[in-house]
């Protein structure tokens, strides 16, 4: 669903920010 896609995108963005 759209909500799940949004959560996945936010999780990936957060992980990306932490790893940088």
UniProtKB/Swiss-Prot annotation:
Q: Which UniProt keywords apply?
A: Cytolysis, Ion transport, Membrane, Nematocyst, Secreted, Target cell membrane, Target membrane, Toxin, Transmembrane, Transport
UniProt domain comment: Composed of a long N-terminal alpha-helix and a core region rich in beta-sheet structures. Before the pore formation, the alpha-helix binds the lipid membrane, partitions into the lipid-water interface and stabilizes the monomeric molecule on the membrane. Finally, it traverses the bilayer, thus forming the transmembrane pore.
* Name of the protein in its database record: Equinatoxin-1''
The UniProt annotation puts the region (N-terminal region) at 11-20
Q: What is the lineage of its organism?
A: Eukaryota, Metazoa, Cnidaria, Anthozoa, Hexacorallia
The domain of life is Eukaryota
GO CC annotation: what is one?
Answer: nematocyst
Report residue spans for region: Plays an important role in the hemolytic activity: 3-12
Q: Which family does it belong to?
A: Belongs to the actinoporin family. Sea anemone subfamily.
Q: What does this protein do?
A: Pore-forming protein that forms cations-selective hydrophilic pores of around 1 nm and causes cardiac stimulation and cytolysis. Pore formation is a multi-step process that involves specific recognition of membrane sphingomyelin (but neither cholesterol nor phosphatidylcholine) using aromatic rich region and adjacent phosphocholine (POC) binding site, firm binding to the membrane (mainly driven by hydrophobic interactions) accompanied by the transfer of the N-terminal region to the lipid-water interface and finally pore formation after oligomerization of monomers.
Biological process (GO) annotations? killing of cells of another organism; monoatomic ion transport
Recorded GO molecular functions are: toxin activity
């Amino acid at each position: 669903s759209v909500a799940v896609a949004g959560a996945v995108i936010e999780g990936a963005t957060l992980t990306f920010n932490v790893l940088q």
